[in-house]
């Protein structure tokens, strides 16, 4: 996130990373690789794997494949959020305990959001109280954050 958030970068940024990391940067909700990294990258940039680099291309050969990922920075974030810092705290809390519901993972995270406030926000959004962070889109995390500000 720090690389993408950095204001000194140009509009397009390319970096070679482990293939697993590149996959996590570009995946969406409901997939096993979706998490805080996916959301952070997708808040600041449009990620796209442009080249897969097999481990056999390196000497000595590493144990993992690599990928070149292209990050095209957004001029403005794709979602309107009142407090980025709060949104990312909620996102991190949601994925710290992946298999727990949002009520339990965020409500017990110590970030200052009560289960009651979270219940009200989720109900306002029309989401079930049993929802997990891995099911929410970036837009839904922004909306949730805005309701909890």
Segments (PLM) and residue ranges:
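A short alpha->loop->secondary-structure connector
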Residues: 11, 29-40
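Residues that scaffold the ATP/ADP-binding catalytic core of kinase and kinase-like folds
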Residues: 24-25, 144
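C-terminal lobe and adjacent flexible extensions of AdoMet/dcAdoMet transferase-like proteins
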Residues: 73, 91-149
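Single conserved hydrophobic/aromatic residue that forms the stacking wall/gate
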Residues: 1-13
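Conserved beta-strand signature within the Rossmann-like core of class I S-adenosyl-L-methionine
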Residues: 11-23
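Residue-level signature of catalytic and energy-coupling elements of molecular machines
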Residues: 18, 69, 137
């Amino acid at each position: 996130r720090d690389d993408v958030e950095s204001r000194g970068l140009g509009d397009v940024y390319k970096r070679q990373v482990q293939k697993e990391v590149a996959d996590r940067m570009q995946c969406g909700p409901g997939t096993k690789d979706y998490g805080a990294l996916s959301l952070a990258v997708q808040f600041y940039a449009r990620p796209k794997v442009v080249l897969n680099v097999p481990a056999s291309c390196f000497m000595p050969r590493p144990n993992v494949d690599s990928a070149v990922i292209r990050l095209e920075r957004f001029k403005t974030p794709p979602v309107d959020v009142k407090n980025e810092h709060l949104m990312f705290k909620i996102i991190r809390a949601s994925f710290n305990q992946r298999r727990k519901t949002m009520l339990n993972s965020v409500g017990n995270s110590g970030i200052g959001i009560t289960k009651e406030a979270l219940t009200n926000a989720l109900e306002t959004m029309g989401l079930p109280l049993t929802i997990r962070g891995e099911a929410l889109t970036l837009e839904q995390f922004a909306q949730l954050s805005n309701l909890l500000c």
